């Protein structure tokens, strides 16, 4: 709800409902990216992100019907279309469009609407995530998944062999 209140502070400049929703979504995106970026600077989280990359590599190897060996896994991409990181980003994007359908005034109603619509936004975002995976091999349509893949450049790191071994198990 912090982005809602931050956006409200900009109401004298961005007074239309559409502008308020865009500003709110921008604040959500900035907070998400900033949080992940600064979190990734810590050694512990960098290691977690390496395990995350290892997990994706194993899934990619499995989906290509290759033998699951450290060598085969290490040759795979650390990015994956069905990643939870992509899902989080899609909730921001989908939320922006869903919230265009509800009023932004008064502020208390906007806060209630945001909370009440969480299941709707999550459900639509999940379907978008599934769709991006289904169309990932279709030129042009695979672009739908790119924002999530770009976010994974922050949330995954190249793993070491030991981390791949753990992911295989």
Where do the model's predicted regions map?
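Alpha-helix N-cap/helix-start motif at coil-to-helix transitions, marked by capping-box chemistry
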Residues: 119-122, 141-145
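Polar-ligand-bearing catalytic/cofactor-coordination segments
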Residues: 18, 22-29, 33-86, 134-136, ...
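Accessory, usually C-terminal, subdomains that scaffold auxiliary metal cofactors
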Residues: 112, 132-135
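Juxtamembrane "helix exit" motif at the C-terminal ends of alpha-helical transmembrane segments
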Residues: 1-15, 91-115, 119-122, 126
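Short hydrophobic alpha-helical module
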Residues: 41, 48, 61-64, 88-104, ...
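Alpha-helical transmembrane segments of polytopic integral membrane proteins
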Residues: 3, 7, 32-42, 51, ...
């Amino acid at each position: 709800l912090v982005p809602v209140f931050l956006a409200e502070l900009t109401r004298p400049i961005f007074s239309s409902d559409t502008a308020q929703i865009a500003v709110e979504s921008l604040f959500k995106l900035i907070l998400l990216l900033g949080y992940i970026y600064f979190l990734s600077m810590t050694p512990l989280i960098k290691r977690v992100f390496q395990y995350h990359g290892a997990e994706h590599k194993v899934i990619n190897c499995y989906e290509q019907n290759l033998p699951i060996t450290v060598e085969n896994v290490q040759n795979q991409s650390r990015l994956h279309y069905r990643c939870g990181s992509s899902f989080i980003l899609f909730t921001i994007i989908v939320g922006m469009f869903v919230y265009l359908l509800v009023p932004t005034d008064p502020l208390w109603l906007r806060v209630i609407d945001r909370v009440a619509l969480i299941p709707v936004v999550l459900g639509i975002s999940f379907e978008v995530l599934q769709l991006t995976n289904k169309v990932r091999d279709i030129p042009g349509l695979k672009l739908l998944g790119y924002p999530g893949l770009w976010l994974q450049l922050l949330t995954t790191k190249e793993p070491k062999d030991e981390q791949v071994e753990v992911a295989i198990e």
